[in-house]
Amino acid sequence: MDTNYIIETKNLTKQYGSQKSVADLNIHVKRGRIYGLLGRNGAGKTTTMKMLLGLTNPTSGEVKIWGKPLQGNEKKLLPRIGSLIESPGFYPNLTGTENLRIFATLRGVPNNHAIKDALDLVGLPYKDKKLFSQYSLGMKQRLATALAVMHDPELLILDEPINGLDPIGIAEVRSFIRELCDARGKTILISSHILSEISLLADDIGIIDHGALLEEESLAELEQKSSKHIRFTLSDTAQAARILERNFHENHFSIQDDHNLRLHNLDLPVGKIVTAFVENGLEVSEAATSEESLEDYFKRVTGGEGIA
């Protein structure tokens, strides 16, 4: 496994009875980047994150973090990770700061500065008399995120951190997550079912559906797949690719399957390309300009609705 990956899984599987919640998952989270795990509700995102944190054991497969197997190295690896999985058990009759002080004591976080820094980062006041029971859902989500970053972890694993937030809160969360990565060098794995937010935040995206990883690419690569292009339907895409490279010195294309190829350079003369294909024995049934939105692309890949 590549040491450039902070998280790497190999055939990670979780099975309950005859039902596979996660099936042969291979994800690769690169150092210093934000990885967005995107999928509809029930796709297997939370189960995957729980296995990455040792909260549930995989049925089969392997998790490596910083190049080391998680199993057997939990005491060394897990203290370097901050996580937000479901809702932490905060005390309702204490303030946010008082709650964090208790967790800081349990975790050996040395001083109040770490608590204040975490609260500042998520936009909650350090000196506040409001009890946790009086918090809105959005404030509770912010406090949970503050708890995840309080001990200054190298890696953050955040399950749906924007749940319950209003648009302003979502923008603020997006901003501080980006800051954690860009200014503080954190590696971040974040899950969501909201495509628009993942596409604004993530450097790399993994699409998960019914427990299986359907795609794993950089955001730029996925945007290229969904951008305006010329679609060719023909008898042999491998041969078509060779013709494009040899005759037109062009490699800005993507092969979809044996019979469908997308050319992303719209400046090339389509007529001459079709002629070259035919002269080299290819049967061309379609050559058309096409455009697919990123949302349409994700819906096509996952086979339907469920991603906002």
Where are these regions (language model features)?
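Short, Lys/Arg-enriched, disordered terminal segments
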Residues: 1-5, 304-308
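Short coil/turn motifs at beta-sheet boundaries
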Residues: 2, 95, 138, 223-225, ...
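ABC transporter nucleotide-binding domains
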Residues: 4-9, 14-190, 195-209, 213-215
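Alpha-helix N-cap/helix-start and coil->helix boundary motif
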Residues: 13, 97, 121, 195, ...
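Generic structural signal for individual residues within well-ordered alpha-helical segments
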Residues: 78, 100-101, 116-119, 171, ...
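Non-catalytic alpha-helical coupling and interface elements of nucleotide-dependent molecular machines
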Residues: 105-108, 303-307
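ABC transporter nucleotide-binding domain
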Residues: 175-264
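Short, charged/small-residue-rich alpha-helical element at the C-terminal edge
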Residues: 228-301, 308
